[in-house]
Amino acid sequence: MKALSIPDVLAEVAVLVRPHFGKGKPADYIPQLATVPGGKFGMAVRMVDGDEHVIGDADEGFSVQSITKVFALGLALNRLGDEIWTRVGKEPSGTPFNHLSLLEAEQGVPRNPFINAGALAVTDVLMDVTRDPAALVRDFGGFLCGERLEIDPAVATSELAHAWQNRAIASLMRAKGTITHDPEAVVAAYCRQCALSMSCRQLARAFLPLAAGGFSPIAQETVFPERLTRRLNALLLTCGIYDSVGSFAYRVGLPAKSGVGGGIVAVVPGKATVAVWSPELDRFGTSVVGTAALEAFSQITNCSVL
C-alpha cells in the first residue's frame, strides 16, 4: 500500500465514482431498504496504527445486512472451531445468494457461510448457545467498533414479512438435518441479525482484527487467533461478494464482504480496513458505486493483495 495522503485519495475516489451513480437500484425485495435515497455515499478508512479518515455519509447508519455474517461466523468459529465445517462448506457457490437448486443437489449442505443458506446454518449453531443470536451478533459488532449498536425494528419486520425464500431454504436444511432448530425461529433470528444498523466508520473499526492479525486496536485485545484471521480473509476473498466474487477480485483484489443495504467492507491485511456505502446495487446485489470506489482506492494506493 503506497504511503499516500488518505484524505487526498478519498477526495479523488469521490470524484471518480460520480459517473456510476444511477447505474443500479436499491434492494426492492426488502421494502424498507427501497426507501433509502440512491445518491447516498460514504467511505471510511481505518489504519491499524490508529489513523482514521472519512468522506461523505460515512457516519450515517444503514442496514448492513449480510456483512453481519462475518460477525456471526467469527462467533461460531470461536466457539466451535473447525466443527462448524461439518455444517457448511468453504467453496464459492457460483449461484445467487438465496438460491435453492445447489443446496438441494448437495443434500442441504451450503457451499459457504456467506450465502443465505450458510448464514442460516451459522445462526442455527449460535442458537445452541443463546436464545437471541441476533443480539449476540449485535453486541459482538458493538464490542469490535467500541460503540453501542442497534437493530432497526422496521427493517427487521419488513425483511421477515418477505422472507419466503429464506423460509424455503431453512425448511430444506431442516429436512436434510443441516439445522436442528425450528426453521421459522432460525429465519426470524437471521432477519433480525441482518437488520443491524452501522455506519462506514463503525464497520471499518469493527473489521480491524482482520487487518491486524486478529488483534482489535479498539478493544485492545486479541479477538481471533492469527490462523483463524487468515482463514476468514481467505473466505472473504473467495466467497464474500456472492457470485460476482471473481469479478470483484479482478477489479479490487481485496478480501471483502458486501450486503444488500449497499455496504462493502474490504480488508488490507497488515494495513487497514476500508468501508464504503452506496445503496444502488448491481444485479448480483452488490453496491455499484461501492465497488467502483474500492476499485479506485485499490488502484491509487496499490493495495491489492493479488
UniProtKB/Swiss-Prot annotation:
<comment type="subunit">
    <text>Homotetramer.</text>
</comment>
<feature type="binding site">
    <location>
        <position position="116"/>
    </location>
    <ligand>
        <name>substrate</name>
    </ligand>
</feature>
<dbReference type="InterPro" id="IPR012338">
    <property type="entry name" value="Beta-lactam/transpept-like"/>
</dbReference>
<comment type="similarity">
    <text>Belongs to the glutaminase family.</text>
</comment>
<keyword id="KW-0378">Hydrolase</keyword>
<dbReference type="InterPro" id="IPR015868">
    <property type="entry name" value="Glutaminase"/>
</dbReference>
<feature type="binding site">
    <location>
        <position position="242"/>
    </location>
    <ligand>
        <name>substrate</name>
    </ligand>
</feature>
<dbReference type="GO" id="GO:0006537">
    <property type="term" value="P:glutamate biosynthetic process"/>
</dbReference>
<dbReference type="GO" id="GO:0004359">
    <property type="term" value="F:glutaminase activity"/>
</dbReference>
<protein>
    <recommendedName>
        <fullName>Glutaminase</fullName>
        <ecNumber>3.5.1.2</ecNumber>
    </recommendedName>
</protein>
<feature type="binding site">
    <location>
        <position position="159"/>
    </location>
    <ligand>
        <name>substrate</name>
    </ligand>
</feature>
<feature type="binding site">
    <location>
        <position position="190"/>
    </location>
    <ligand>
        <name>substrate</name>
    </ligand>
</feature>
<dbReference type="Pfam" id="PF04960">
    <property type="entry name" value="Glutaminase"/>
</dbReference>
<feature type="binding site">
    <location>
        <position position="166"/>
    </location>
    <ligand>
        <name>substrate</name>
    </ligand>
</feature>
<feature type="binding site">
    <location>
        <position position="66"/>
    </location>
    <ligand>
        <name>substrate</name>
    </ligand>
</feature>
<feature type="binding site">
    <location>
        <position position="260"/>
    </location>
    <ligand>
        <name>substrate</name>
    </ligand>
</feature>
<dbReference type="GO" id="GO:0006543">
    <property type="term" value="P:glutamine catabolic process"/>
</dbReference>
